[in-house]
Regions:
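Beta-rich strand-turn-strand
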Residues: 118-121
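Short, well-ordered loop/turn sites that connect or cap secondary structure elements
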Residues: 127-128, 147
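Ferredoxin-like alpha/beta domains used as RNA- or RNAP-binding modules
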Residues: 2-115, 142-214
Length: 214
């Protein structure tokens, strides 16, 4: 099979809607929090039907896998991720990979997730969309809203009594947020302390950039 045709076939495979288990098995448990369990590890360690081993992906296939990891991890559409890459590719200075990571991590839905206020990015995306947060005294309902150093994120007064925010003290007692964000339980507000630093070993952002440069 010619390289171009094989690349197209690989791409189509990833466009098929799959249950989360299959997505995690293909892309790795880091994509969804629910896949980071002993049960998933045991199930995913089983060989393919017939004892077959998965074929080693092509270079294009590896790049595609990394792209899909980011898409599913942050809950982005193809267009959204493509636009992020275009924006950082035209920025001079620091490495493009670092800039892309900063943009992704600075999304409000991700920041709320990093503060420990939701069990997943999908959950915090809904929380933001439903208007539960105030950023610098303004209600924000756009999950992709980009926060900056010094921004203050508060739980809206009318939302504090809602079930999703019950027992926050208990939920956060063993949680350690990244060093670039903080959350004050007494005042029910968080703050952006610094730029996000890429400490992820699960994501290969350079491979994603290579995918879009093809």
């Amino acid at each position: 099979m010619d390289q171009k045709l094989r690349s197209q076939e690989e791409y189509k495979k990833f466009m098929i809607s799959k249950p989360k288990f299959k997505i995690c098995r293909r892309l790795g448990p880091g994509v969804y929090d629910k896949c980071q369990t002993a049960k998933f590890s045991a199930a995913s360690s089983k060989s393919l039907p017939g004892g077959k081993r998965p074929k080693a992906p092509t270079e294009y296939g590896v790049q595609l896998i990394e792209k899909q990891k980011i898409r599913f991890s942050y809950g982005l559409s193809e267009r959204q991720l493509s636009n992020y890459v275009k924006k950082v590719s035209g920025v001079k200075g620091a490495g493009t990979a670092d800039k892309l990571y900063e943009r992704l991590e600075s999304r409000l839905d991700n920041v709320v997730y990093r503060m420990g206020l939701g069990s997943s990015r999908r959950a915090t995306r809904q929380m933001v969309s439903h208007g539960h947060f105030i950023v610098n005294n303004h209600r924000v309902t756009v999950p992709s809203y980009e926060v900056k150093i010094g921004d203050i994120i508060k739980i809206r007064e009318g939302s504090k009594a809602k079930k999703i925010f019950e027992n926050l003290t208990e939920k956060l007692k063993d949680y350690t947020a990244p060093t670039w964000v903080s959350f004050d339980l007494n005042n029910m507000e968080g703050r952006i302390l610094a730029k996000p630093k890429n400490t992820e070993t699960f994501l290969n952002i350079n491979a994603v950039l290579e995918f879009y440069s093809r």
